[in-house]
């Protein structure tokens, strides 16, 4: 893993850089300058340059959780810090570190190939390792926070490097401190995961259980679970390389018991899931589908016909188009159910 010590040359700065290929929605936008950061020391050297002392900065990983609404007048930092290694173990877990620029899915499959299970439910999620804790990505009964040990970051304000433990990150549902107090103020350079030696499969979702059964997996191992999740995701979700999208566009809303009672009275078939804290999680895709949006377009952006949670670029869409259909969907769901949908991606 690249360290933070030693001299490193400044990364090349590309002026008036095209960002369309760097965001999975395929939205057109340009940046005043684009820097590809392959080593933490490059970042420190760049931040020391007076030309960029007060300039707006945007950290870009895989561009899979981003809606670009126009040109970015500042410096875009594309994270390309690589490397992955076992950094230690104890009686309970292996500790595995990866550079923030590593492809998330490739990293997950690599850990499984090494015999270090624990991330299999998060297979095929687009994006980079560094973005995973920022969003606290999750799928099929598991969140990154449950396998997280620590991360290394660089302050974009001072250039100082420091490490954050799990409690420091304030993880929540698709949430972390990086979306609040530290939003736009840091760049993650590496992440260390805690992968359990006493592994048990997480098969709480019916889709996963049914897929494993169809494959004849009576006592599934980690790779079996990963393969099942990959198959499910490929059936339900479009490949960003073929159809522009950012995966699930809306968070599943969390409500209280009183709101649930009101909703179930009018919609007895409403899917809902009780949470450990007594709150109730709803299926945003079901709400969107009931409002008639599944498979429907508004201009060049549409709701994917196989999964109502996903918005897709039908061709030539802009960030303004995405914002328009997202707001229209939110308005319809609010009018019909009295529930507010919150977008997952960040609008810039």
Swiss-Prot record:
GO terms for cellular component: cytosol. Signal peptide: none annotated. GO terms for molecular function: FAD binding; UDP-N-acetylmuramate dehydrogenase activity. It comes from Aromatoleum aromaticum (strain DSM 19018 / LMG 30748 / EbN1). The active site is at residues 174, 248, 344. Belongs to the MurB family. Residues 27-198 form the FAD-binding PCMH-type domain. The lineage of its organism: Bacteria, Pseudomonadati, Pseudomonadota, Betaproteobacteria, Rhodocyclales. Keywords: Cell cycle, Cell division, Cell shape, Cell wall biogenesis/degradation, Cytoplasm, FAD, Flavoprotein, NADP, Oxidoreductase, Peptidoglycan synthesis. This is UDP-N-acetylenolpyruvoylglucosamine reductase. Its EC number is 1.3.1.98. The gene is murB. HAMAP family: MurB. The keyword Cytoplasm applies. It catalyses: UDP-N-acetyl-alpha-D-muramate + NADP(+) = UDP-N-acetyl-3-O-(1-carboxyvinyl)-alpha-D-glucosamine + NADPH + H(+). It is found in: Cytoplasm. Gene3D superfamilies: 3.30.465.10, UDP-N-acetylenolpyruvoylglucosamine reductase, C-terminal domain, Uridine Diphospho-n-acetylenolpyruvylglucosamine Reductase, domain 2. InterPro entries: FAD-bd_PCMH, FAD-bd_PCMH-like_sf, FAD-bd_PCMH_sub1, FAD-bd_PCMH_sub2, MurB, MurB_C, MurB_C_sf, Oxid_FAD_bind_N. It is an enzyme of class 1 (oxidoreductase). Its cofactor is FAD. Pathway: Cell wall biogenesis; peptidoglycan biosynthesis.
